[in-house]
Amino acid sequence: MATSNEAGSVLNRVPPLLTDLYQMAYAYWRAGRHNEPAVFELFFRDNPFGGGFSLFAGLSDCLLFLQNFSFSDDDVQYLRSVLPADTDAGFFSYLKELDCSCVSVSAVPEGSVVFARVPLLEVSGPLAVVQLLETSLLCLVNYASLVCSNAARFRLAAGPRRRLMEMGLRRAQGPDGGLTASRYTYIGGFDLTSNALAGRLYGIPVAGTMAHSYITSFSSLEEVWPQTLKPCGGGDSIDFICLVKGLLGRVCQLLGSKTNLIREGELAAFLSYAIAYPQNFLPVIDSYSVRCSGLLCFCAVALALFELQYRPLGVRLDSGDLCRQSLDVRRVFRECSKHFSVPQFESLIIVGTNSISEQSLSELNKKDNEIDVVGVGTHLVTCTRQPSLGCVYKLVEVRGRPRMKLSEDPEKSTLPGRKAVYRLLDADGHPQMDVLCLCDEAAPAAGVELQCFSLLGNSTLQCSITPAQVSSLRTQVFSCGQITLPLNSASESRERAQISLQMLNPYHKRLQEPHNYTVALSERLHSLVSDIKKGNSKGSNFLLSN
């Protein structure tokens, strides 16, 4: 279940004024249409990153936003100052009383695998109110789903064994972008974050290493203070510097390395850090030279920690050929483990970071390497391959009548009417097809052949399918101003995402040239679309948009 920290984070970031000014719905109110019952759908048109799927995220934030939607007196006063001077004063009184008590929402569960053209949210209620919600809901879903999907692709590229750490806060588009990224990359499959606030708010495991600046700030062993460390089990303090210097000589002798190439400042930094964090010692070892200094200093300090009954964690590599260096580091770990009779030494963690992208992670996975944890920042949180998911929020029904946008760009046409969404599964539980039906149609049945029309770009193709299993994809999550289901925590949504991805066929999960997943229309919905296009449907409408 979501924590109070998560709820507070959303409420502080997403007030009702987080919307486009043109959404203020004054014209609806002026025409007396503001209370007409209406239905909108939120969906995206194309799967992101050239892939075969997306993950739906942002639902919890949307529901918290809806539950607390109301304009303050200060909000209304500000709107008075920016709307035209001749705006009817009654409209501002209307805004003061506005809330979502008459709004209902059905949604796909957060963390679910979803596909293009499938309505993720159905929002129904008074026309002016549900129109006012458009920008905020899009803002909450677009980036969350995009970065969550990006994280899932990184997870697929990395494979199940390797741990992934999100460390993109300093590269993100502002603090809110960084916080959102930390949460939704965790849901998408990352294991850790470097973002301390995200750890506090969302319960995400937090990890970190050492900055290069910490190492380069030292130049001499004389700067190390304190110079002693007590054994983990208690007892008198040990001269840690003396212990490490003795071990460093033995390490260099074992490996045939030259002691005169070791950077004293790097050794001093490692000593100081180990004394401060004896249970979490994981330094970056490439500030100068991995082979000639960083790795040697680490081994000496780590062996000293083991001798005092502490358990160092490992090292981080942040430049150069990560695969080759990781193999060299692991070889040295094994030699030290055997020579110094410290079995745990050979299994110390190796973290790799260095502007990791999905492509470089896939390439890394094809080569021999000993990297246990990969840290990803820029390419993850900024979604460099695609900056936006492109979710849209479109009117599909007013006063019980279907509405359809007919566009000069066929890709921007919408599907009319209130719908139910079903996922058809094969005998192994793999999704085969998502079918959109009108809400008053009977649900597809397992073992019964279904005639439908698959969406192929801007056209449709008649097809038939006999599903082994059928599941309804959406459930009601908001009604009468209240959230109707417990909100999932980040870890609960993450678990759903993992299960949902495991169920997906491998050929839909391929990072390159995946098979297209079929989304189809029922026969009745297809007929409605055809009738409206021909102008034959009662109450049909034609909205042209460039």
Curated annotation (Swiss-Prot):
GO terms for molecular function: metal ion binding; nicotinate phosphoribosyltransferase activity; transferase activity. The modification Phosphohistidine is found at residue 212. One of its GO terms (biological process) is response to oxidative stress. 5-phospho-alpha-D-ribose 1-diphosphate binds at residue 378. This is Nicotinate phosphoribosyltransferase. Activity is highest with Mn(2+). Coiled coil: none annotated. CDD domains: NAPRTase_A (cd01570). Transiently phosphorylated on a His residue during the reaction cycle. Phosphorylation strongly increases the affinity for substrates and increases the rate of nicotinate D-ribonucleotide production. Dephosphorylation regenerates the low-affinity form of the enzyme, leading to product release. It catalyses: nicotinate + 5-phospho-alpha-D-ribose 1-diphosphate + ATP + H2O = nicotinate beta-D-ribonucleotide + ADP + phosphate + diphosphate. Pathway: Cofactor biosynthesis; NAD(+) biosynthesis; nicotinate D-ribonucleotide from nicotinate: step 1/1. It comes from Danio rerio. Pfam families: NAPRTase_C, NAPRTase_N. Keywords: Cytoplasm, Ligase, Magnesium, Manganese, Metal-binding, Phosphoprotein, Pyridine nucleotide biosynthesis, Transferase.
